[in-house]
Regions:
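N-terminal helix-loop segment corresponding to the beta1-alpha1 unit
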Residues: 1-164
Length: 166
């Protein structure tokens, strides 16, 4: 038996941080349900494709997950997601602050149907502050922090760091 056996995770994340988090939770035995929009997850279309419509990135980061499609812009899609969340232990989401509130899927609303739910919002700059609505990925944050200026291969004091390799 794995450490997270019996834990149900709803993964409605976007991009690497959320996909990776859900993957690790699944590796530890959690029942992870990946929710995709009707258009499918953007990572499906990354190059190179392992299979038609499935990139290596998508396959690697979504191992140990079951998948469903839900359109939160429709009442049926919202009801489906709320039903899943009512029975879940963890909710992973990776949208800008306030986006899910438009659809009644924000923390305050979801907490009413499942007070025990761990609601994990993954954003580039957090929920508060002047940058909260800005999109960000690793490269943006590294640049803003000034790390790129230290990554001079010819310099004796260059900083070495490794990007994620799957």
């Amino acid at each position: 038996m794995k450490a997270l056996t019996g834990i149900k995770v709803i993964d409605f994340s976007k991009w690497l941080p959320g996909h990776y988090c859900g993957m690790v939770l699944g590796d530890f035995g959690a029942d992870v349900i990946k929710v995709e929009t009707p258009a499918g997850d953007d990572t499906r279309r990354f190059f190179p494709e392992a299979l038609p419509g499935m990139s290596y990135w998508h396959l690697a980061l979504n191992r140990n997950k079951r998948g469903i499609t839900a359109d939160i812009k429709t009442e049926g899609g919202r009801k489906l997601l709320l039903r899943l969340l009512s029975e879940a232990d963890v909710f992973l989401e990776g949208f800008r602050p306030g986006y899910l509130a438009r659809y009644g899927l924000d923390y305050a609303t979801v907490r009413e149907i499942n007070p025990q739910l761990v609601y994990c919002s993954i954003t580039g700059f957090g929920q508060t502050g002047s940058y909260r609505h800005k999109p960000a990925h690793d490269l943006n944050v590294i640049g803003l922090a000034g790390l790129n200026s230290l990554d001079d291969v010819g310099s004796a004091c260059a900083v070495s760091y490794t990007h994620l390799t799957l």
